[in-house]
Design a protein with these regions (language model features):
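Long, charge-rich low-complexity segments
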Residues: 108-114
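Structural signal for well-ordered, non-membrane alpha-helices
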Residues: 15, 41-45, 97
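GST-like domain detector, emphasizing the conserved glutathione-binding G-site
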Residues: 1-39, 49-52
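GST superfamily/GST-like fold recognition
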Residues: 54-79, 85, 90, 96
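Surface-exposed helix-capping loop/turn segments at secondary-structure junctions
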Residues: 46-57, 100-106
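Catalytic cores of transferase enzymes with a strong primary signal for eukaryotic protein kinases
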Residues: 18, 70, 102
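Alpha-helical packing segments of well-folded alpha/beta enzyme cores
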Residues: 33-40, 44, 69, 92
Length: 114
């Protein structure tokens, strides 16, 4: 269904552009990759215009799968991301970033040594 299509597009197209954008040393090329990836972000933003999740009016598997990649993309140049008129997507991102589960998962721990 729609959920698997989104996840496949994320994994097979968006993730490729994210990596090219994030690790690109050539500024002009990075901007090109960012623009190419932006169409996927706009689609996600549109999906969130009248519901809480990407596929339903609640957070589902697809949201959890796609969130880490949107987070990575946003933090390459967060100021740029905030100025992209992706308000629904940014609100969705903030809900994840502020969730207790995310805070627990991202806690820093001492390095385990045995």
């Amino acid at each position: 269904g729609k959920s698997m299509q989104l996840i496949e597009e994320n994994d097979n197209k968006f993730k490729v552009l994210l990596d090219k954008y994030k690790y690109c040393r050539d500024k002009k090329l990075a901007v090109k990759y960012r623009q190419e990836a932006k169409s996927f972000l706009h689609r996600l933003n549109e999906l969130l215009s009248n519901q809480l999740g990407l596929c339903k009016n609640e957070i589902t598997f697809s949201d959890i799968c796609i969130f880490p990649f949107v987070r990575q993309f946003a933090f390459v140049d967060y100021e740029w991301f905030l100025n992209c008129q992706l308000d629904n997507l940014n609100d969705w991102l903030q809900k994840f970033l502020n969730s207790e589960l995310f805070k627990k998962v991202m806690q820093k721990h001492a390095i385990y040594e045995h």
